[in-house]
Amino acid sequence: MLQVGFRLRDLLTQAGANVVMTRTTPDPVDLGLRAIISRRANAHAFVSIHLNAFPDGVNPFVNNGSLTLYFWPQSIPLGVVTQAALLDELGLRDNGTKYQNIAVARGTWMPSILTEGAFVIMPDQEAAMRTPTIQEAYATAILRGLQSYFASLAPTP
């Protein structure tokens, strides 16, 4: 989902954020290295953008939609607001915000989430994710989640 990552980078930059991408080409980057990159950058948040799929034998008509995963408890608030924005922007089934022992987030110390915008095993969701409109919606959802999360940390007057 590099296209979504690039669009999110542009949206965040326009909003005044400093963005460090752990991957800018289709070549894979080791999951542990992604955490190291985020720590070295002193990132305030880490978001890993994905599309979900299931192994053989899992019913895709039961398991489909958007999902946000976290490893560390301090990531729950970011996950919850991002998941809500994903549902609003993409309009897919809510698979929740859930703990999972995800390698990409274990080595981070900032709020870290992994988003699964849709399921590529579902032909309609896969086709939609290939369109610029839905890619923009996915990026916008993550932007909204980050904005909501950081706004919640601001001191009240």
What are these regions (language model features)?
Residues 2-157:
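Active-site-proximal helix/loop segments of hydrolytic enzymes
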